[in-house]
């Protein structure tokens, strides 16, 4: 289970116990986030390197196949892994992810501004990170328990790690070229209240094979705003995949 940009494993606190009743949740934090390191080498942050890291985790767990789950930017990374290692993936769960389904023009725009955005964060430090709209302190609609946990973890955000994420992860996150040949059963837990994701949802629905979509009346933070619905949806999906 991989969280989103400027988030941490704390975003799953209302999901872990419920999911543990029918599977073994394993969480991973992005470079520069939570307890993960912040390598200076920007290549560590490329989505393809994350795929390699996920495969190492699978091997360390000594499992031949598994379910993977990603949220937002994390979903772009787990979806990439799922497409490239479909023989190891029993099923893939993802939430709204504009980075995963970014168009070619959007990816080009991100690449054009990547260096400047990264440099601004590396120079400005935590105060610059706090100004980013998706910083946890701005997520006032989250349940108070999750909001407090994410805000507490936000002091662990590393300027070098966040800068390199903007330089290498986000600009290269789109899986459109891979998604059109998706082999693994995939579930999109669609937070219907996030209007800016609608175009991406339509693209995925039209172009990604083996994808099912479940509507959940929530915004971007679907697993945090509606944890019970998210947990039940994931459980149903896992049971369905187990019979395939």
Language model: regions and residue ranges:
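Active-site loop/oxyanion-hole signature of alpha/beta-hydrolase fold enzymes
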Residues: 13-17, 23-69, 73, 232-235
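Active-site glycine-rich loops that stabilize anionic/oxyanionic intermediates
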Residues: 4-7, 72
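Alpha/beta-hydrolase active-site loop signature
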Residues: 6, 30-34, 99, 219-222
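Flexible "cap/lid" loop of the alpha/beta hydrolase fold
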Residues: 79, 83-84, 90-122
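Catalytic histidine-centered segment of alpha/beta-hydrolase-like enzymes
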Residues: 218-231
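Conserved loop-alpha-helix segment in the C-terminal half of the alpha/beta-hydrolase fold
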Residues: 183-218
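Conserved alpha/beta-hydrolase catalytic His-Asp/Glu region
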Residues: 103-109, 122-180
């Amino acid at each position: 289970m991989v969280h989103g940009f400027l988030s941490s494993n704390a975003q799953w606190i209302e999901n872990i116990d419920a999911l543990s009743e029918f599977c073994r949740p394993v969480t991973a934090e992005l470079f520069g986030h939570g307890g993960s390191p912040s390598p200076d080498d920007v290549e560590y942050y490329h989505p393809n390197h994350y795929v390699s890291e996920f495969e190492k985790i699978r091997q360390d767990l000594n499992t031949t196949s598994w379910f993977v789950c990603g949220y937002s930017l994390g979903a772009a990374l787990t979806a990439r892994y799922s497409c490239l290692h479909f023989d190891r993936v029993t099923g893939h769960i993802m939430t709204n992810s504009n980075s995963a389904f970014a168009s070619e023009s959007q990816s080009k725009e991100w690449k054009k501004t990547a260096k400047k955005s990264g440099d601004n964060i590396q120079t400005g430090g935590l105060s610059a990170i706090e100004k980013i709209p998706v910083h946890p302190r701005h997520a006032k609609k989250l349940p108070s328990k999750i909001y407090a946990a994410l805000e507490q973890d936000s002091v662990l955000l590393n300027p070098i790690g966040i800068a390199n994420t903007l330089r290498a992860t986000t600009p290269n996150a789109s899986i459109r070229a891979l998604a059109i040949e998706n082999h693994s059963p995939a579930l999109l837990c669609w937070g219907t209240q996030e209007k800016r994701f609608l175009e991406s949802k339509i693209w995925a629905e039209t172009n990604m094979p083996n994808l099912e979509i479940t509507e959940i009346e929530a915004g971007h933070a679907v697993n945090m705003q509606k944890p019970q619905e998210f947990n039940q949806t994931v459980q149903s999906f896992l049971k369905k995949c187990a019979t395939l």
